[in-house]
Amino acid sequence: MRVYSPGRVNLIGEHTDYSYGYVLPMAIDRYTVIEGEPHERVELYSEHFKKSVSFELEKLEKGNNWADYVKGVYWVLQREGYEVGGMKGRVGGNLPLGSGLSSSASFELAVLAFLNEAYSLKLSRLDMALLAKKAENEFVGVPCGILDQFAIAFGREGKAIFLDTETLDYEYLPFPEDLEVLVFYTGVKRELASSAYAERKKAIEEALRVLGKSSSKYVTEEELSKLPEKERRYLGYVVRENSRVLAFRDALKEGDVEAMGQLMVEAHRDIAENYRVSCEELDFFVEKALELGALGARLTGAGFGGSAIALVEHGKGESLGREVAELYTKVFPWTPEVFVVRPSEGVMVL
């Protein structure tokens, strides 16, 4: 059996999902691939790490390595009462790890889809997204929202996804065929479980508690004045970002490419200045991409390194990416990865 599980880019709506706001991601045509068969225990070889891991299903102890994502999936399935056996196989693919393209969620969904097929668990795509999030939150220990798992489970070729992360209502939006998304991986690995991510999440939760709101969607600009300075700055960014997601959705429906690009640029400047999760490398890419003709550009994912994206006219992404990469390597010691992506199908078993 072979499973393809895509990565994702978030076109707009960053750091809004853990306060139940709006997001607008798409699954991409870069994949985690698992090739294997059912087995009595777990035996997996990682082509990326060039290492094997094996464990019994009764012994799901964290090891602080890539196997934790597999163990987390088993742990949550067992807790939810599913009868599931082991797996034996290889993990590979062309999705860069630690790049801000949701390689961890992609891996978890790949494991879930494999087990769903192998053991006839009858899980829906929503079931798989929610189980993967629970594994990440409660076993791996990363306090992420639902964005990544949902995008990877529900991806559709040629479509972006508008998602309300509170209600989980979603809408497929056709992505313009005359545009493409350039991904620029800075080479700066970022640990999502870092204290900075957790600190922002905690500040947002505290701000919502003070205001008596269940979601950032319900907070107005006027209400922000009731908050201390740090919480006001952080939640202010999230409130504005929710508005930008709605505006981006409208622009996408109307084919207003200029508005889409402008909203991406505003989003990046706001997140860099007020949420403070950007870095020199991400800012450099955004600035240079815009100078070289990108319609819009911004960081994607949690920030603190990882990847940025640019919205470009179809056929121009690769050359623009190469130009920025050439400038980038003269300034920074990292080797970037540059590639063009299109909206892709969600996790699939072949």
Swiss-Prot record:
The keyword Kinase applies. The keyword Signal does not apply. SUPFAM superfamilies: GHMP Kinase, C-terminal domain, Ribosomal protein S5 domain 2-like. Disulfide bonds: none annotated. Substrate binds at E14, H15, T16, D17, Y197. InterPro entries: Galactokinase (IPR000705), Galactokinase_bac (IPR022963), Galactokinase_CS (IPR019741), GalKase_N (IPR019539), GHMP_kinase_C_dom (IPR013750), GHMP_kinase_C_sf (IPR036554), GHMP_kinase_N_dom (IPR006204), GHMP_knse_ATP-bd_CS (IPR006203). Its EC number is 2.7.1.6. ATP binds at S46, G98, S99, G100, L101, S102, S103, S104. GO terms for molecular function: ATP binding; galactokinase activity; magnesium ion binding. GO terms for biological process: galactose metabolic process. Keywords: ATP-binding, Carbohydrate metabolism, Cytoplasm, Galactose metabolism, Kinase, Magnesium, Metal-binding, Nucleotide-binding, Transferase. The active site is at D148. It is found in: Cytoplasm. Pathway: Carbohydrate metabolism; galactose metabolism. Belongs to the GHMP kinase family. GalK subfamily. HAMAP family: Galactokinase. This is Galactokinase. It comes from Thermococcus kodakarensis (strain ATCC BAA-918 / JCM 12380 / KOD1). The lineage of its organism: Archaea, Methanobacteriati, Methanobacteriota, Thermococci, Thermococcales. The gene is galK.
